[in-house]
């Protein structure tokens, strides 16, 4: 018996013919051809040629096999005879013949490719002791070089990527180009979910930094934007307030002395910019004489704010008295005209005509304004307002009203810009975060503190009450008031723990004792300006410098 191993050893390069299956596939079904029948006919011819060649080669191969086995004839005569019988039944062929058959079949495949047909899975042949599988891959006829036959056939098979690898290559190749588009798509999809960014979303510190670069007029306009801007603008306005008159400063004192939150915002107090109520290049004696002066030329001062509730000193009372005087004069004229001649009777008639003419003109102007105004209310809005019985109220606009005008009874104080000592003590006692104070060129008006025995009670948060706070015109009793001096203001400044800069230039009420207390008792003070201050001109301590320099000067 012969085992397969002995048969393979005795083959010596012979190739066994095994049953073969052929398959044909079409890469691109470009035309409908009966390829199945044609392929079967071509494969039948190939099989017959292979079998005929194997019969012719049988004799030559058996002779070569006998020549190689001369040394083993004595031992294996029976095995050779049996092997010859087996080879005759198996039909052996050589490798050269197989290569020629493959080349012929390759040309047949190329001709079939030209017709749009492809052939795959050619028969597998075992070569010698090893097994090698050779398959003819289908090549897509995309160019002319694929149709030209090659002179030498390569042992390396061409790589044809599968459908999965092609899709992966497209994904990898297109990932670079589509990465930016995908990021944009994700951003657009999530952008509508993010809240809209505006000034209200900024932190309070950033908003304060932005508003700090605006002037006072622009900061005042920010009060009318919204609540968030209002809170930021209020902090900035009270942080470094600016005063143009003593009337505005009196309003500020009333606010901070009754509101601790607003008082905590104040860090810098500058009163050196305050101007008098009346400024004229000519002689100021015209104010005290009977020369006519326009009412709008004199601005109100702190005394007008103090007496704002008194109808005698308020502007409303003045307008009321002016209207009453005009009506009484017209009545007296009408009474006298009834007892006079016809020439005098024509005067009130002319006045009535002028009044009716003015009324008629005003009505015409009103109708013209309603017809041509820019914004007209709809009928629904007007109907809703009629049902509510509420008048149309125009919103307040900043800087729409001018500075208040001084009362004619207080015109004698219009050239002065003095400030009562009680007002300054109120501010220093309420604003505990002050770091910079400048009251240069500011004269102080004498003031009195109201004692507890009086019927007036303090309303300020500090518990202080001064005569400058009470609208009282009659004389105070001696036991109801206590005089207040500038030295009391210095004592109040000593309580400020954050005060660093103090400017007291050209102030006659500054004394050496007050300067000594400021330098020695206030530890936070860094800079002090006393230029041209004091009753004595050219005093040694009336200089501007650091606290250490003033200490050396005062020794």
From Swiss-Prot:
Domain spans labelled F-box: 196-246
Purpose of the protein: F-box protein probably involved in ubiquitin conjugation pathway.
Protein name, per record: F-box protein COS111
Keyword Zinc tagged: no
Domain of life, source organism: Eukaryota
Record's compositionally biased regions (Polar residues): 48-61
Residue segments, region Disordered: 31-82, 124-147, 327-354
Pfam families (UniProt xref): F-box-like
Alphabetized UniProt keyword annotations: Ubl conjugation pathway
PROSITE patterns: FBOX
């Amino acid at each position: 018996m012969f085992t397969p191993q002995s048969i393979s050893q005795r083959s010596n390069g012979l190739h066994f013919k095994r049953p073969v299956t052929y398959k044909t596939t079409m890469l691109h079904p470009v035309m409908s051809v009966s390829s199945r029948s044609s392929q079967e006919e071509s494969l039948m011819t190939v099989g017959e040629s292979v079998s005929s060649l194997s019969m012719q080669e049988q004799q030559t191969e058996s002779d070569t096999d006998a020549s190689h086995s001369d040394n083993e004839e004595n031992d294996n005569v029976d095995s050779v005879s049996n092997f010859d019988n087996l080879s005759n039944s198996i039909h052996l062929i050589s490798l050269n013949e197989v290569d020629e058959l493959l080349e012929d079949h390759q040309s047949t495949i190329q001709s079939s490719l030209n017709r749009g047909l492809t052939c795959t899975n050619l028969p597998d042949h075992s070569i010698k002791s090893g097994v090698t599988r050779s398959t003819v891959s289908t090549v897509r006829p995309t160019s002319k070089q694929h149709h030209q036959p090659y002179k030498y056939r390569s042992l390396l098979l061409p790589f044809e990527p599968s459908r999965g690898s092609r899709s992966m290559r497209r994904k990898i190749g297109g990932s670079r180009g589509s990465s930016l588009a995908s990021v944009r798509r994700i951003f657009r999809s999530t952008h509508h979910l993010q809240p809209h960014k505006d000034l209200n979303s900024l932190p309070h510190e950033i908003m304060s930094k932005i508003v700090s670069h605006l002037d006072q007029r622009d900061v005042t306009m920010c009060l009318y934007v919204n609540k968030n801007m209002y809170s930021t603008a209020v902090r900035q306005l009270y942080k470094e307030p600016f005063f143009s008159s003593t009337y505005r400063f009196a309003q500020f004192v009333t606010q901070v002395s009754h509101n601790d939150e607003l008082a905590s915002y104040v860090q810098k107090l500058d009163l050196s910019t305050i101007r008098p109520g009346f400024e004229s290049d000519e002689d100021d004696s015209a104010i005290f004489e009977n020369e006519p002066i326009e009412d709008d030329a004199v601005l109100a001062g702190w005394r007008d704010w103090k007496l704002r509730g008194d109808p005698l000193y308020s502007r409303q009372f003045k307008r009321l008295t002016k209207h009453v005087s005009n009506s009484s004069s017209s009545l007296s004229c009408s009474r006298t005209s009834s007892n006079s001649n016809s020439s005098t009777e024509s005067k009130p008639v002319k006045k009535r005509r002028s009044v009716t003419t003015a009324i008629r003109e005003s009505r015409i102007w009103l109708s013209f304004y309603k017809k041509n105004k820019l914004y007209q209310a709809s009928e629904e809005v007007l109907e809703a307002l009629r049902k509510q019985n509420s008048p149309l109220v125009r919103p307040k606009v900043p800087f729409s009203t001018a500075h208040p005008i001084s009362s004619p009874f207080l015109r004698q104080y219009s050239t002065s810009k003095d400030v009562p000592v009680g007002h300054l003590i109120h501010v220093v006692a309420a604003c505990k975060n002050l770091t910079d104070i400048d009251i240069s060129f500011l004269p102080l008006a004498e003031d009195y503190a109201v004692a507890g025995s009086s019927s007036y009670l303090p309303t300020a948060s500090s518990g202080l009450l001064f005569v400058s706070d009470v609208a009282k015109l009659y004389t105070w009793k001696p036991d109801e008031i206590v005089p207040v001096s500038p030295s009391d203001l210095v004592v109040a400044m000593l309580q400020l723990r954050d005060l660093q800069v103090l400017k007291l230039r050209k102030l006659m009420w500054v004394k050496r004792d007050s300067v000594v207390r400021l330098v020695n008792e206030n530890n936070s003070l860094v800079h002090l300006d006393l230029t041209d201050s004091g009753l004595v001109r050219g005093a040694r301590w009336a200089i501007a410098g650091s606290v250490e320099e003033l200490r050396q000067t005062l020794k």
